[in-house]
């Protein structure tokens, strides 16, 4: 079994949300099989930035990326999160 790398775009509730704190909250609430490989910020508009997370997770996860989106969407300070890319790691 191999892993996949999921690119997740996380939109904060407002421009007042601290993205570093949001990143910490997300990383603490992810299942133990998930690992954040990299994080970036992306300007959206009017001072609002999105958090871009590169998450490694098992390929054979039941429900695919739905579980990842659900966990992140239920965190305080998150407006919504969406998968913008996915690729298989290894062969």
UniProtKB/Swiss-Prot annotation:
User: Which key words tag this protein in UniProt?
Assistant: Elongation factor, Protein biosynthesis
Output the Pfam families linked to this UniProt entry: EF1_GNE
Keyword field contains Protein biosynthesis: yes
Recorded GO MF terms? translation elongation factor activity
Q: What InterPro entries does the record point to? A: eEF-1beta-like_sf (IPR036219), EF1B_bsu/dsu_GNE (IPR014038), Transl_elong_EF1B/ribsomal_bS6 (IPR014717), Transl_elong_EF1B_B_arc (IPR004542)
Q: Which CDD domains match?
A: EF1B
SUPFAM superfamilies the UniProt entry points to: eEF-1beta-like
Instruction: Give the protein family.
Output: Belongs to the EF-1-beta/EF-1-delta family.
Query: What is known about what this protein does?
Result: Promotes the exchange of GDP for GTP in EF-1-alpha/GDP, thus allowing the regeneration of EF-1-alpha/GTP that could then be used to form the ternary complex EF-1-alpha/GTP/AAtRNA.
NCBIfam families of this UniProt entry?
A: aEF-1_beta, PRK00435.1
Q: What is this protein called?
A: Elongation factor 1-beta
Organism for this UniProt entry = Saccharolobus islandicus (strain L.S.2.15 / Lassen #1)
Gene responsible for this protein:
ef1b
